């Protein structure tokens, strides 16, 4: 096949060999063409018509609409290599072409491909010589950071994969083969690099060159401890695939785990912090409830806060002070929220400008945003709000950027640079716009000078502009006219000024475009000089938007300021679940509950039926604890919360078919992780541990877990269970809680209110009935339950034959009552029949009883 290909196709095949894992967008004129397997795959994903030329499958998309097709491929986790043709190629043969960019899900900077409120991370994981590290980069926001895993490598890595949800991961081949299955890495787009590629000396050289430093110590690294290999993997990957896309990265954030609350991957999922567990969108998550931010930067910071609760009480209180200020000054809060609508994504715009990916509107958006910045300063001064971390030099720098853009960039759709900014550009624009006017003015001046009234200026493609003089006026031709052509009835002349005017007019259009772009690029360069202070402005906007948002929500939702302490306590009065309350507020009133945990009484066992609110109560405590640690007010009338180093949440049942793990094995793995890693300062939330196995095994395991937590870990714990036997545990730190139930006739009302006593019944059959199980099944379950209650000492094996024997009450099974008959009506009928003493009634009484029975049956079936 390759022997008979055209020169252009040979060029394509050579390029494809270098980018085997990417779909090549091969520029041909005004189209991007795809060939061979790329064309087959792209045609299916993009719904394009697949054609053939000389047996080569091909499809294409127009250049001017290519962005939307690229975006769709990125959403399918595909890599796209953009291969452009040279603009002014002089070589013989096909036009010169080269790949100018490889767009992948992890290195997107185009705003059309990004979600405003979510960071777009590329991650690299390194295990070089057992120095484990995790590096992440979001090119769109200039964020580059690293975590050192000095211990608990596996648990922390799982946590961070969930937290950062990377679009793309770089790992060594050895790491991939060892951990791919354990970490389920194939859910991500993976870039595997050969093990020999991880070289310490090459890594040091690459990092030093990028940051223009003499040694890695200036970045916070010890060169003898090569955690920085993961940073090298990121830098090298981007340099090999993209051009000018690292110029915005000028620092590395080295994350300190000890500053933040530990939330493992299971807890992040079970608490539905930033996405729900149904469709994985943000709806019904804590983030969705707390997110009423007005800026994209504020929304992203909120996600970061939720996933990284802090442990420093003074820092938390500073945030709470700011939230309280805006909660109390609601008029200012509403003014700011209205103004924040005009703040654009400065963080991403500055990154694009640094990477030379800017367009005109980026600068106009910065100008609008900075005008809000000055307004915020005035409002803060007026209301004596003391959060202002800009000095005079920085304020002057911000003003320079604002006035530069304001004076230079035009908001008019048909103009880039404003008139008056550059005199030379203005003259070129005038010449371009008024060319005919200048020609007419010059013609009129020569008519007056020569007295030739019918003097004309004409133009041909070959000769350009010239004066035309008829025979009768030859004697009046001025001496500075230079004859260029003689015709039968006239002569054509040029002058130095006409030649110059024509040249200026011809060059004006190209000159305007080129010179305007030159000025535009110069303005961009000047703005980039202020990138550090502009990034600081972006951080300021994000934080202020977030605390204003928290203050607004506190006022709107009646949240209260939590008190953070160093004690082992959680005290909540009239607490509510923030998410459930938010989504049911239009249909019902959420039931408030108390929580009382301290160093003496720190383990709560919660019993009660399903649907009574146990799981909601558990999550409620965890979410309120987390909200307090991010600096938010909380849904409670009063909250006192001891600093919590870790939250563990083991709720729900699921299996892991990919790993061949049963529901019970998953449950035990998660429980083992909690028991290994929890400390006395942790909060443990566990729901229905032990239900994935036999009753006796489950009860024994649950009892042993509780005992271990009480005696060895001593963490604040809430443990929901259906094993009522556990309520008999006798320990000084043990508290029995249950969910209140009110019986109204044969109906149960779940009050969803916690009380300090154990529950003696799960009411499972009642729940099954209201869930819609066939009445025949429900009735049979009641019979079996009663039989079980009378045979407490019998084993299950002894009992099963018994309930299937002739002595068992088979009336329920024979009963062909319609499934819609209510259970209480059936029980009433059964009670009526059971009370008949057939040995002591007269024939007349029996007829009367039979008549009553018929009437009851008729009334119940009607």
From Swiss-Prot:
Stated name of the protein: DNA mismatch repair protein MutS
Disulfide feature: none
UniProt keyword terms in alphabetical order: ATP-binding, DNA damage, DNA repair, DNA-binding, Nucleotide-binding
Molecular function terms from GO: ATP binding; ATP-dependent DNA damage sensor activity; damaged DNA binding; mismatched DNA binding
Binding sites annotated in the UniProt record for ATP: 608-615
Family: Belongs to the DNA mismatch repair MutS family.
GO biological-process terms attached to the record: mismatch repair
Gene for this chain: mutS
Domain of life, source organism: Bacteria
Annotated PANTHER family: DNA MISMATCH REPAIR PROTEIN MSH1, MITOCHONDRIAL, DNA MISMATCH REPAIR PROTEIN MUTS FAMILY MEMBER
Classification via InterPro entries: DNA_mismatch_repair_MutS, DNA_mismatch_repair_MutS-lik_N, DNA_mismatch_repair_MutS/MSH, DNA_mismatch_repair_MutS_C, DNA_mismatch_repair_MutS_clamp, DNA_mismatch_repair_MutS_core, DNA_mismatch_repair_MutS_N, DNA_mismatch_repair_MutS_sf
Function: This protein is involved in the repair of mismatches in DNA. It is possible that it carries out the mismatch recognition step. This protein has a weak ATPase activity.
Keyword DNA damage: yes
